[in-house]
């Protein structure tokens, strides 16, 4: 009587590989998401201010900036206005900023956090307060663009949002 030796099946020979592959792809940190295209200007929503024009500046290496009128600092809070609405925010930190380009000077700025709604998501975002009266009220940095997973089209505006009459 001949003895039969069982050879391992293909499934047995790969061990736990299928399980490892499934676990790898089930972990969201391993997912590669294709960025959405957006224009260099888009509309975002920040409560209590509502819809605001924002510029996505790929050359801005510092921090996201928001326009602030009538700033008053008391203790660890700053009261400031934008679009006729006044709010009080906790100061995260005070920084000395070197402003380059045509402006070229140093100044102290206050950093705060605000919730930004964009592309159906809500993002807690740090901003530095600055007088941007003659410029776009919000300037987003590369870190924000990475978090919301957008690729900026530098020659287009309002790709994912509608402009209305805000501009």
Residue map of PLM features:
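Pepsin/retropepsin-fold aspartyl endopeptidases
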Residues: 2-167
């Amino acid at each position: 009587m001949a003895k039969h030796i069982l050879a391992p099946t293909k499934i047995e020979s790969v061990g736990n590989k299928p399980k490892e592959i499934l676990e790898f792809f089930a972990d969201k940190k391993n997912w590669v998401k294709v960025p959405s295209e957006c224009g260099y200007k888009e509309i975002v929503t920040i409560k209590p201010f509502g819809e605001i024009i924002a510029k996505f500046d790929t050359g801005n290496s510092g921090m996201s900036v928001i326009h602030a009128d009538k700033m008053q600092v008391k203790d660890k809070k700053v009261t400031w206005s934008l679009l006729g609405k006044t709010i009080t925010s906790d100061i995260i930190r005070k920084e000395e900023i070197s402003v380059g380009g045509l402006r070229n000077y140093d100044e102290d700025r206050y950093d705060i956090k605000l919730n930004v709604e964009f592309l159906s998501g809500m993002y807690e975002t740090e901003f530095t307060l600055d007088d941007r009266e003659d410029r776009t009220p919000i300037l987003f940095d590369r870190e924000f663009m990475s978090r919301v997973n957008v690729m900026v089209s530098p020659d287009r505006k309002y790709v994912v949002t509608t402009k209305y009459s805000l501009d």
